[in-house]
Amino acid sequence: MTDESDNYNDFMMSDEDMDSIEMEDEENDVEGDEGQRGGQEWVQNYEQGLSLWNDENYVAARQVFLKTLSMLVSEEELIEMRCKIHRQVLECWCKILMYGEPDNEQSTEIIADFRNFVELVNELHGKANCSLDLSSMFHHVTMDFMPNIYDRTFIPGITDDEESSKWAKMTFKTTILQILQGSWVCHTFPEVGLLLQQELHVLQAWIKTFDKERDLYAISESLRKDINTLNELQLILQCYIARYIEDQHLLCNEGEVFRMCLNQLDQKCNESLAVAQRSDINLILHFSKALFLILFELDQDDLGDGNKVTGSTCVRRFVTIHKFYQNIECCKEEFWECLKNLEELGTNKFRFERFMQIIVGGFVLCAMIMHRGSQTRLAGTSGNADINPFDYEQLRIAPDHIFVDKLRRIYDVFVGLQIQEMHSCLIELECIRAPLSRLFDQVCYLIQKRKLFSEIAPIYSCISIQDLRQKLQIDPSVPPTRDEILVHLMRYCMQDRGINFKLDLVADTVTFYSEQHSEPLHDAVFSETRMGHKSHKSSISKDRAIVEDIKAAHEMPEVEYAHDIGILESQVDSQSHSKSNTKSMSRHVSGHDPDSFGQDTISFFDTLRLARETYQGSNIDNSVYTIAKLTNEALQEISNDVR
């Protein structure tokens, strides 16, 4: 019953009572220490330093702690207490450096304090009954001293003004880590030595990135052999980003390493809420994902037939059109996340001018590719593909208004299919054209394709390829080649679109058919020609029956069958010529004159060959059915007589 009443009294105790009890306990502890240590004055100074520390007055607290240490210099039995106080001095420096960079005088004092700390720790080496956890102490000092050294430090976004200060800061902290490595603790406790070695390795790699003749490939190669820490992942991904922005070059065999680093950083963000909430890490992660999609998931021929290349040594591959638009949408989302991370970091345009331009440009280009990417929304893609990207707040309040206006102009040109204005827009965006060349190439391809089939095809029933080259010309000095025009046509044909066309590679012409003629070509021509022959139906009824028999026998429409053997002639008078040749052939066949039969047969097929080679698709007239009838009649007679 006594225990229950005591618990009840403790539960009902007020906060003031608890504070008074804690103060009494602290006073008892201090009185015990004073009684044990002879009531020395250093205890009061130490308590004063702790009070200043709690008040976040770290400069004054450090001075008091140093004064306390000077009182204990001759106290060999209190060497462990001296280590504790010395650690408090270093903790004060860590807090001070969080709010600014050290000047030359402070740097000298910090180095001296760290040297004294290491010497004091070395004095404890071999001492029995040491109650200090030196391994934990070194670990905390290192981790408390290193935070924020990499925050807001981006290789692609660092300016010349920041470069010298960042270099000095990292060089200074490298010196500190080298001092800590001189302690016996690093050799006795492997985990401490490994931690210091990893941090030192990353710092030295960072210092190399500030060199004007830096080799980012060598830096990334030295880091990727043993990736253990978050800082190493950050740096190696930044090396990839900086290398691509500078020279747009990454080796094919680096794709898997890039993917591995991305997966590891993504996993760390998923496992740790503290890491996931860091905007600088998220910026690197999302930009790296967008870069990986552009480099290794998109290809110049992604809007082609969708065939895949197997057995390639490169990670790049052809993808289907459906997969292509999914990748573009993912790339757009990654750039969008980068914009939000930049907003959270509060960066100004002078520090991240080039980096931000690439992010904003990539976002707008992906939106352009997704705009009217298909007549119906592709499965697996969002329904906001046609939302104007400049309606987003991040672009409306972007600090670089001039650059955003340039992007707005190319967006309007693309949507309006103003292909003649595209070249000047590309020149204005030359600053980001190299790193985003793959997206620019896709934009140029799409505006040509949509111009061809949205504005040219509905207007022109027949147009030459040379005229198409002029109408689809982006660069005034370099028109598209004939092969490029044919590639546009063949890809469109393979995608099973609504507009049908007929390609004449001899005359280099393209004949377009409207959407209502989406049925096969021979059916459309058959219906049109039949209407033209309606007035002559009575005169050719017998011939028509023969042609229908041939059509049924060969399971082909008459026009298609005639075209298959190449007899579509443009001259009306060729009808009588073909008829006389047919009768001549029939007479020789019936008379069984082998020589005459062979000569006339050769002459007949020479005529067919000549007709095919000189055929002009735009001059097809009503004589086609008579020609088809006469030719097939002659072939039928030849076949019967030979049997």
UniProtKB/Swiss-Prot annotation:
Principal location: cytoplasm
Highest rank taxon of the organism: Eukaryota
Keywords: Cytoplasm, Nucleus, Signalosome
Complex and partners: Component of a COP9 signalosome-like (CSN) complex.
Function: Component of the COP9 signalosome (CSN) complex that acts as an regulator of the ubiquitin (Ubl) conjugation pathway by mediating the deneddylation of the cullin subunit of SCF-type E3 ubiquitin-protein ligase complexes. The CSN complex is involved in the regulation of the mating pheromone response.
Disordered: region residues: 1-37, 573-594
GO CC entries: COP9 signalosome; cytoplasm
Residue ranges occupied by any PCI domain in the UniProt entry: 331-517
Protein name: COP9 signalosome complex subunit 10
Compositional bias annotation for Polar residues: 573-584
Location relative to the cell: Cytoplasm; Nucleus
Biased composition (Acidic residues): 1-33
Keyword Phosphoprotein included in the entry's annotation: no
